[in-house]
Design a protein with these regions (language model features):
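Extended, charge-rich alpha-helical scaffolding segments
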Residues: 1-84, 94
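Short terminal interaction segments
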Residues: 80-159
Length: 159
């Protein structure tokens, strides 16, 4: 394997490992959401942030390899570099494909988790609005101490 391909291979291997960790955290978060263990959600924020910081660092290393070869620091530049090393280092192409697959998986899981969170939040907001309306309480306090009005758009009952 040429030295350039070895550097690229190590860089991609690092990104793959980082993405696997990130996907695992997203799957754990998803299980907490599915099972209603909402008190556990806060514990995922720090590992996700650490993963994203590391993935950003590793991605920058890959982009630097592209720039060092006078290529554009984007997907087109990466594909051009891979074509140059296709015969001498086919494992680098396989690593790139795995990276793309893991990236798509992470994106899908993150979107799905966001949808699950939004659904739970909507349900909580509707329940609070119903409770405040039934108790004829015009609002509540937000975390910063400001007043938050609770008004439903639907009449719950007519006496």
């Amino acid at each position: 394997m040429p030295p350039d391909a070895a550097v690229l291979g190590r860089t991609l291997a690092g990104e793959i490992a980082g993405l696997r960790t990130f996907v695992a955290v997203l799957r754990e978060e998803q299980q907490s959401l599915i099972h209603g263990a909402l008190e556990q959600l806060a514990q995922f924020a720090e590992p996700k942030a650490k993963c994203l910081i590391e993935l950003t660092r590793l991605g920058e290393l890959r982009l630097q390899v592209l720039r060092d070869h006078g290529l554009s620091a984007d997907r087109a530049g990466m594909e051009r570099l891979l074509r140059e090393h296709a015969k001498s280092a086919p494992q680098v192409l396989a690593a790139w494909r795995e990276l793309l697959t893991l990236t798509a998986d992470a994106h899908h899981l993150n979107d799905l988790n966001g949808t699950l969170i939004a659904t739970r939040l909507r349900g909580t907001q509707q329940a609070l609005a119903a409770l405040f309306s039934a108790a004829r309480i015009p609002g509540a306090y937000a975390a910063d101490g400001s007043t938050v009005p609770y008004r439903t758009l639907h009449q719950l009952a007519v006496a």
